Amino acid sequence: MARYDLVERLNVTFRELEHALMEMRDGLADCRLLAARVFSLPEVEKGKEHDPLLTISVTQKIGKEAQEAALRHFTHLFIQQQSEKRSSKAAVRLPGAVCFSVDDAQHEALHALADKINALKTQLEEIITVESGLPSTQRFEWVHRYLPGLITLNAYRRLTVLDNPATLRFGWANKHIIKNLTRDDVLAMLERGLKAPRAVGGLTKEQWHARLTQEYNDIAALPQKARLKIKRPVKVQPVARVWYAQNQRQVQYACPSPLIVLCHETRGGAVPDIGELLNYDAENVQHRYKPQAEELVMMIPRLHLYLAP
Protein backbone atom coordinates (compact mmCIF):
# COMPACT_ATOMS: atom_id res chain seq x y z
CA MET A 1 0.00 0.00 0.00
CA ALA A 2 2.84 2.38 0.87
CA ARG A 3 4.44 1.76 -2.54
CA TYR A 4 1.12 2.44 -4.27
CA ASP A 5 0.73 5.69 -2.33
CA LEU A 6 4.23 6.75 -3.39
CA VAL A 7 3.46 6.09 -7.06
CA GLU A 8 0.23 8.06 -6.70
CA ARG A 9 2.14 10.99 -5.17
CA LEU A 10 4.74 10.75 -7.95
CA ASN A 11 2.05 11.05 -10.61
CA VAL A 12 0.06 13.77 -8.82
CA THR A 13 3.17 15.85 -8.12
CA PHE A 14 4.35 15.58 -11.71
CA ARG A 15 0.94 16.51 -13.15
CA GLU A 16 0.83 19.56 -10.87
CA LEU A 17 4.33 20.52 -12.01
CA GLU A 18 3.43 20.07 -15.66
CA HIS A 19 0.32 22.23 -15.25
CA ALA A 20 2.22 24.94 -13.35
CA LEU A 21 4.93 25.06 -16.03
CA MET A 22 2.34 25.53 -18.75
CA GLU A 23 0.75 28.26 -16.65
CA MET A 24 4.16 29.95 -16.36
CA ARG A 25 4.70 29.64 -20.11
CA ASP A 26 1.33 31.26 -20.81
CA GLY A 27 1.87 33.94 -18.16
CA LEU A 28 5.21 34.97 -19.63
CA ALA A 29 3.78 34.94 -23.15
CA ASP A 30 1.19 37.48 -21.99
CA CYS A 31 3.88 39.89 -20.76
CA ARG A 32 5.55 42.46 -23.01
CA LEU A 33 8.94 41.17 -24.15
CA LEU A 34 11.72 43.73 -23.69
CA ALA A 35 14.76 41.69 -24.70
CA ALA A 36 15.78 38.07 -25.09
CA ARG A 37 19.06 36.34 -25.81
CA VAL A 38 19.63 32.59 -25.46
CA PHE A 39 22.46 30.31 -26.52
CA SER A 40 21.85 26.83 -27.92
CA LEU A 41 24.50 24.22 -27.15
CA PRO A 42 25.28 21.09 -29.19
CA GLU A 43 23.21 17.98 -28.48
CA VAL A 44 24.80 15.27 -26.34
CA GLU A 45 24.43 12.06 -28.32
CA LYS A 46 23.58 8.70 -26.79
CA GLY A 47 26.68 6.93 -25.47
CA LYS A 48 28.70 10.16 -25.26
CA GLU A 49 27.35 11.45 -21.93
CA HIS A 50 30.68 11.01 -20.16
CA ASP A 51 32.99 12.18 -22.94
CA PRO A 52 35.15 15.15 -21.89
CA LEU A 53 34.04 18.49 -23.29
CA LEU A 54 37.07 20.24 -24.74
CA THR A 55 35.14 22.63 -26.99
CA ILE A 56 31.52 23.83 -27.07
CA SER A 57 30.13 25.77 -30.02
CA VAL A 58 27.37 28.22 -29.15
CA THR A 59 24.49 29.25 -31.44
CA GLN A 60 22.76 32.50 -30.49
CA LYS A 61 19.06 33.33 -30.73
CA ILE A 62 17.68 36.80 -30.01
CA GLY A 63 14.32 38.53 -29.72
CA LYS A 64 11.11 36.63 -30.45
CA GLU A 65 12.99 33.52 -31.57
CA ALA A 66 14.86 33.45 -28.25
CA GLN A 67 11.63 33.92 -26.30
CA GLU A 68 9.96 31.01 -28.09
CA ALA A 69 13.00 28.79 -27.51
CA ALA A 70 13.01 29.70 -23.80
CA LEU A 71 9.31 28.98 -23.31
CA ARG A 72 9.70 25.60 -25.06
CA HIS A 73 12.71 24.83 -22.89
CA PHE A 74 10.84 25.34 -19.62
CA THR A 75 8.33 22.63 -20.59
CA HIS A 76 10.86 20.23 -22.18
CA LEU A 77 10.43 17.23 -19.87
CA PHE A 78 10.27 14.15 -22.11
CA ILE A 79 12.62 12.45 -24.55
CA GLN A 80 9.73 12.34 -27.02
CA GLN A 81 10.18 16.13 -27.37
CA GLN A 82 13.71 15.80 -28.76
CA SER A 83 15.82 14.08 -31.40
CA GLU A 84 16.13 10.30 -31.14
CA LYS A 85 19.92 10.69 -31.28
CA ARG A 86 20.01 12.95 -28.21
CA SER A 87 20.82 11.28 -24.89
CA SER A 88 18.08 11.17 -22.27
CA LYS A 89 20.77 10.93 -19.57
CA ALA A 90 22.14 14.42 -20.27
CA ALA A 91 20.07 17.46 -19.36
CA VAL A 92 19.26 19.93 -22.13
CA ARG A 93 20.92 23.28 -21.41
CA LEU A 94 19.88 26.65 -22.82
CA PRO A 95 21.73 29.49 -21.07
CA GLY A 96 20.59 33.06 -21.61
CA ALA A 97 17.90 35.45 -20.41
CA VAL A 98 14.41 36.59 -21.32
CA CYS A 99 13.33 40.01 -20.03
CA PHE A 100 9.73 41.11 -19.60
CA SER A 101 8.00 44.31 -18.56
CA VAL A 102 5.60 43.60 -15.68
CA ASP A 103 3.11 45.50 -13.57
CA ASP A 104 2.45 44.87 -9.86
CA ALA A 105 -0.07 42.07 -10.44
CA GLN A 106 2.09 40.26 -13.01
CA HIS A 107 5.18 40.61 -10.83
CA GLU A 108 3.45 39.08 -7.81
CA ALA A 109 1.77 36.31 -9.80
CA LEU A 110 4.93 35.22 -11.64
CA HIS A 111 7.02 35.14 -8.48
CA ALA A 112 4.36 33.11 -6.67
CA LEU A 113 4.11 30.70 -9.60
CA ALA A 114 7.91 30.29 -9.80
CA ASP A 115 8.00 29.51 -6.06
CA LYS A 116 5.27 26.90 -6.54
CA ILE A 117 7.09 25.33 -9.49
CA ASN A 118 10.39 25.14 -7.63
CA ALA A 119 8.69 23.60 -4.58
CA LEU A 120 7.09 20.94 -6.82
CA LYS A 121 10.45 20.24 -8.48
CA THR A 122 12.06 19.74 -5.06
CA GLN A 123 9.18 17.50 -3.99
CA LEU A 124 9.45 15.41 -7.16
CA GLU A 125 13.19 14.95 -6.71
CA GLU A 126 12.66 13.95 -3.06
CA ILE A 127 10.10 11.30 -4.06
CA ILE A 128 12.38 9.81 -6.71
CA THR A 129 15.78 9.99 -5.01
CA VAL A 130 14.90 9.57 -1.31
CA GLU A 131 11.40 8.26 -0.66
CA SER A 132 11.62 5.57 -3.35
CA GLY A 133 14.45 4.00 -1.35
CA LEU A 134 16.02 2.85 -4.61
CA PRO A 135 19.72 3.05 -5.54
CA SER A 136 20.51 5.28 -8.51
CA THR A 137 20.92 2.24 -10.78
CA GLN A 138 17.27 1.25 -10.27
CA ARG A 139 15.59 4.66 -10.26
CA PHE A 140 15.58 5.04 -14.05
CA GLU A 141 13.50 1.91 -14.59
CA TRP A 142 11.12 2.80 -11.73
CA VAL A 143 10.49 6.36 -12.91
CA HIS A 144 10.04 5.37 -16.56
CA ARG A 145 7.55 2.67 -15.61
CA TYR A 146 5.16 5.40 -14.43
CA LEU A 147 6.37 8.44 -16.39
CA PRO A 148 7.71 6.99 -19.66
CA GLY A 149 10.41 9.13 -21.25
CA LEU A 150 10.78 11.62 -18.37
CA ILE A 151 14.12 13.47 -18.38
CA THR A 152 14.56 13.74 -14.62
CA LEU A 153 17.42 16.26 -14.82
CA ASN A 154 15.16 18.65 -16.72
CA ALA A 155 12.30 18.06 -14.29
CA TYR A 156 14.48 18.79 -11.25
CA ARG A 157 16.00 21.99 -12.64
CA ARG A 158 14.70 25.07 -10.83
CA LEU A 159 13.58 28.32 -12.43
CA THR A 160 15.53 31.48 -11.62
CA VAL A 161 13.56 34.74 -11.55
CA LEU A 162 15.43 38.05 -11.21
CA ASP A 163 14.16 41.55 -10.50
CA ASN A 164 15.56 44.63 -12.23
CA PRO A 165 19.21 43.67 -12.85
CA ALA A 166 21.38 46.20 -14.66
CA THR A 167 23.66 43.85 -16.60
CA LEU A 168 23.91 40.13 -17.31
CA ARG A 169 27.22 38.60 -18.42
CA PHE A 170 27.67 34.96 -19.38
CA GLY A 171 30.65 32.65 -19.12
CA TRP A 172 31.84 29.15 -18.30
CA ALA A 173 32.73 27.63 -14.93
CA ASN A 174 34.94 24.60 -14.29
CA LYS A 175 34.05 23.13 -10.91
CA HIS A 176 34.59 20.14 -8.66
CA ILE A 177 32.15 18.38 -6.36
CA ILE A 178 33.96 18.11 -3.03
CA LYS A 179 32.76 15.98 -0.12
CA ASN A 180 34.77 15.59 3.09
CA LEU A 181 34.72 12.13 4.67
CA THR A 182 36.17 10.37 7.69
CA ARG A 183 38.02 7.09 7.47
CA ASP A 184 35.03 5.32 9.03
CA ASP A 185 32.66 6.87 6.46
CA VAL A 186 34.68 5.36 3.62
CA LEU A 187 35.03 1.99 5.35
CA ALA A 188 31.26 1.81 5.83
CA MET A 189 30.75 2.62 2.14
CA LEU A 190 33.17 -0.12 1.07
CA GLU A 191 31.61 -2.60 3.50
CA ARG A 192 28.25 -2.19 1.80
CA GLY A 193 29.86 -3.12 -1.50
CA LEU A 194 31.56 -6.16 0.02
CA LYS A 195 28.25 -7.43 1.39
CA ALA A 196 26.59 -7.24 -2.03
CA PRO A 197 29.16 -8.57 -4.52
CA ARG A 198 28.42 -8.06 -8.20
CA ALA A 199 30.14 -8.09 -11.56
CA VAL A 200 31.26 -4.57 -12.50
CA GLY A 201 33.05 -3.11 -15.50
CA GLY A 202 34.06 -6.42 -17.05
CA LEU A 203 35.22 -7.90 -13.72
CA THR A 204 33.71 -11.06 -12.26
CA LYS A 205 32.12 -10.98 -8.81
CA GLU A 206 35.26 -12.54 -7.38
CA GLN A 207 37.58 -10.01 -9.06
CA TRP A 208 35.39 -7.10 -7.94
CA HIS A 209 35.30 -8.45 -4.38
CA ALA A 210 39.10 -8.71 -4.40
CA ARG A 211 39.43 -5.10 -5.56
CA LEU A 212 37.03 -3.85 -2.88
CA THR A 213 38.92 -5.85 -0.26
CA GLN A 214 42.21 -4.23 -1.29
CA GLU A 215 40.60 -0.78 -1.20
CA TYR A 216 39.14 -1.52 2.24
CA ASN A 217 42.51 -2.63 3.58
CA ASP A 218 44.24 0.48 2.18
CA ILE A 219 41.76 2.77 3.94
CA ALA A 220 41.73 0.73 7.17
CA ALA A 221 45.52 1.18 7.38
CA LEU A 222 45.11 4.97 7.67
CA PRO A 223 44.88 6.72 11.06
CA GLN A 224 41.30 7.03 12.32
CA LYS A 225 41.45 10.83 12.08
CA ALA A 226 42.74 10.82 8.50
CA ARG A 227 41.19 13.55 6.32
CA LEU A 228 39.64 12.06 3.21
CA LYS A 229 37.72 13.82 0.48
CA ILE A 230 35.98 13.04 -2.77
CA LYS A 231 37.00 15.60 -5.36
CA ARG A 232 35.17 14.86 -8.57
CA PRO A 233 35.27 17.18 -11.58
CA VAL A 234 31.96 18.10 -13.16
CA LYS A 235 31.56 19.14 -16.76
CA VAL A 236 32.01 22.78 -17.58
CA GLN A 237 28.84 24.73 -16.80
CA PRO A 238 27.40 27.98 -18.19
CA VAL A 239 27.04 30.70 -15.55
CA ALA A 240 25.61 34.22 -15.44
CA ARG A 241 27.19 37.11 -13.54
CA VAL A 242 24.46 39.60 -12.74
CA TRP A 243 25.01 43.17 -11.59
CA TYR A 244 22.36 44.93 -9.50
CA ALA A 245 22.95 48.67 -9.70
CA GLN A 246 20.51 49.61 -6.94
CA ASN A 247 22.52 47.87 -4.22
CA GLN A 248 25.86 47.77 -6.02
CA ARG A 249 26.44 44.01 -5.92
CA GLN A 250 27.21 41.19 -8.32
CA VAL A 251 25.69 37.71 -7.99
CA GLN A 252 26.72 34.60 -9.94
CA TYR A 253 24.00 32.16 -10.95
CA ALA A 254 24.21 28.73 -12.54
CA CYS A 255 22.60 29.16 -15.93
CA PRO A 256 21.50 25.85 -17.48
CA SER A 257 18.16 27.48 -18.37
CA PRO A 258 17.22 31.01 -19.40
CA LEU A 259 17.02 33.46 -16.51
CA ILE A 260 13.55 35.00 -16.22
CA VAL A 261 14.10 38.74 -15.78
CA LEU A 262 11.20 40.88 -14.58
CA CYS A 263 11.57 44.60 -15.22
CA HIS A 264 9.22 46.58 -13.02
CA GLU A 265 9.41 49.83 -14.93
CA THR A 266 7.41 51.84 -12.35
CA ARG A 267 10.08 50.93 -9.79
CA GLY A 268 13.01 52.04 -11.89
CA GLY A 269 13.62 48.79 -13.72
CA ALA A 270 15.19 49.42 -17.12
CA VAL A 271 16.02 46.94 -19.87
CA PRO A 272 19.24 45.22 -18.74
CA ASP A 273 22.35 44.97 -20.87
CA ILE A 274 22.58 41.30 -21.88
CA GLY A 275 26.03 40.05 -22.86
CA GLU A 276 27.13 37.21 -25.11
CA LEU A 277 28.18 33.65 -24.27
CA LEU A 278 31.35 32.83 -26.20
CA ASN A 279 32.35 29.40 -27.45
CA TYR A 280 34.16 27.25 -24.87
CA ASP A 281 37.71 26.08 -25.52
CA ALA A 282 39.39 24.15 -22.69
CA GLU A 283 42.87 24.96 -24.00
CA ASN A 284 42.29 28.71 -23.79
CA VAL A 285 40.62 29.04 -20.38
CA GLN A 286 41.89 32.08 -18.50
CA HIS A 287 41.43 32.08 -14.72
CA ARG A 288 40.93 35.42 -13.01
CA TYR A 289 42.17 33.88 -9.78
CA LYS A 290 43.25 30.30 -9.22
CA PRO A 291 44.14 29.52 -5.59
CA GLN A 292 46.99 27.17 -4.79
CA ALA A 293 45.53 23.67 -4.82
CA GLU A 294 45.86 21.52 -1.72
CA GLU A 295 48.29 18.64 -2.23
CA LEU A 296 46.23 15.47 -2.20
CA VAL A 297 47.18 11.79 -2.40
CA MET A 298 44.98 9.61 -4.60
CA MET A 299 43.57 6.64 -2.67
CA ILE A 300 40.74 5.18 -4.79
CA PRO A 301 40.68 6.52 -8.37
CA ARG A 302 37.22 5.15 -9.27
CA LEU A 303 35.70 7.14 -6.37
CA HIS A 304 37.89 10.22 -6.91
CA LEU A 305 38.88 9.67 -3.25
CA TYR A 306 41.95 11.50 -1.95
CA LEU A 307 43.89 11.71 1.31
CA ALA A 308 44.41 15.29 2.46
CA PRO A 309 47.50 16.29 4.48
UniProtKB/Swiss-Prot annotation:
Keywords of the record: Cytoplasm, DNA replication, DNA-binding
Cellular localisation: Cytoplasm
One of the protein's GO biological processes: DNA replication termination
Name of the protein in its database record: DNA replication terminus site-binding protein
Entry's family note: Belongs to the Tus family.
Record lineage: Bacteria, Pseudomonadati, Pseudomonadota, Gammaproteobacteria, Enterobacterales
One Pfam family recorded for the sequence: Ter
GO MF assignments: DNA binding
Top-level taxon in the UniProt lineage: Bacteria
One annotated Gene Ontology cellular component of this protein: cytoplasm
Annotated signal peptide: none
